Amino acid sequence: MNNINDNAAAAGSRPARRLNLVPLDERYGIGGKVIGVANAGPQVHVGISLADCRYHIHCLGPTGTGKTTLLARMILDDVEAGRGVAAFDPAKGDLIRDLLARLPKECGDRLVLIDPDEQQAPPAINLLDPAVHGGTAHDVAANLTAVMAKVWHRWWGHRTADICYHGLLTLAHLPGATLAQLPRLLSDGKWRAGRVNAVTSSLNAWEGNTLGEFWEGLNDLPAAQRSGLVAPLLSRLRLVLAHPMASSLFGVPATTFSFADILDGGVLLCRLPKGVIGEDGTRLVGSLLLAGLWQATTARARIAEDDRPDASIVLDECHNFLHLPIGIDDALAEARGLHTNFVLAHQYLGQLSGDMAEAIDANARNKVYFALAPRDAIDQSRHLRPYLDDGDLIRLGGYEVVLRPVAGGRIVPPVTADTEPPPPAEPGRATALRRAAREHTGLPLAERRRLLGETATGVGADDEALSGDELTQPPIEPPIEPHNFQPKGVDPERSPVTPQVTSHEAPREARRGDEHAGEHAPLHTTYAHVNDDEEDWWTGTD
């Protein structure tokens, strides 16, 4: 078998590239988000300033009232101004299609397109690479487990969390391992034994023993009982990863874009239609990508506030994706100071869980309402009194909104406005932008086959056991950069293709002085649990 170090080096033979971000001093535009034109009094544009957008925007309105049109205008304004924006579309995908036909052609070299229709050279990101998140293998396992716990909370419990966390932790210690290999790790005993042996023998004694004891305990269970314990996680994970879009995105030991680059001026368009990739696929893929953006947001704390460029994360049907490792209330509160604003759009309040609804109600202080159903109008009219009541919200016309904004950090009286239509579609623009995204942040199929074939831990690799020596690497410190901006006209290879990090994580944990690093417990993360009455661990029901 080839040495894993050689394989990792082969995967990293391509030079690192960056998205071609617009420098801060060259960014222009309205400096905020235009909502529409006032239809009472002087016909002037009304909107939210850039600083006040950091208080986040809650956009509520049933289907057919004009939400998608407004979201498209917001995103186009951000892109044209050179700001970073990530947009998630879980419905029919019309929002992303409309944007591709209208975005400026100059944004092609900072565009990342995640779309099931892209099959020639879709992007890739290895979520198990600690360098992608800027943390350790423990952080990777804890964050991904927390996301899955919230996405699948109805079928989740302590043992599922235990199995998921230790499986992800094992793979995160393996150079070239990917999320797509978690089902094989849990179901293929021979393949698992080689990988577990390699990882435990390469770690510090206390850490390797703790991880080894977990797998020994699982292996000692009767086969039927072991299968029952892993079945809930396996059945749902396989269902998602079986789709070509999910496997092409998360199943290759390479990364072609950076979440930090997106926030610093890139454009991430995620078209995740439920009718194509399934409801579980939409929720898990979108939530994992959002969690990556959240980790990049928290990393901005290392940058001086004046150097943090404003970025927007636009979530259509937001309830599908708000499964962050921390609470939504905490995330919205922290994101404001880190200059990342959320635009949270959905159709009616019943789509939100109780905690989610309270967090959005309190922390997304800019309110945009389209014509609402009576129940929602009664509830939300408390934000508008004494100026407007629930009847005013019910009687709004098509593409008409009530904006209750924040100005200078203070809530101001609401205004009514008519939203503006997006600019006309440009013939051939979508095709040109798809081609540009493919060239700058896509990974061709031939390259994917090479990476999977040359990486010792790749799917399809032989089952020969790995030795610990093959995993031991000199530690690599990820650089701490103040920002990701480059002047225009730099090297044309602009987007990152980062291979799986080959550094051993234990030395870095020792330097951090984390006394709990060897305990394999989630770091600063609480799992979502169900109670004992809601889960049958021993029959494997899911």
Language-model segments: which ranges?
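Conserved H-loop
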Residues: 345-351
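Conserved AAA+ ATPase core "coupling" helix
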Residues: 376-383
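N-terminal helicase ATP-binding lobe
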Residues: 80-83, 386, 498, 524
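A short helix-turn-beta junction within AAA+ P-loop NTPase domains corresponding to the substrate/partner-engaging
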Residues: 356-369
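Conserved AAA+ ATPase "SRH/arginine-finger" region at the nucleotide-binding site
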Residues: 115, 367-375
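P-loop NTPase motor domains
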Residues: 29-43, 50-52, 60-65, 70-340, ...
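Conserved P-loop NTPase motor module
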Residues: 1-36, 191-198, 228-232, 267, ...
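Short, glycine/polar-rich helix-capping loops at beta-to-alpha or helix-loop-helix junctions
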Residues: 95, 351-359
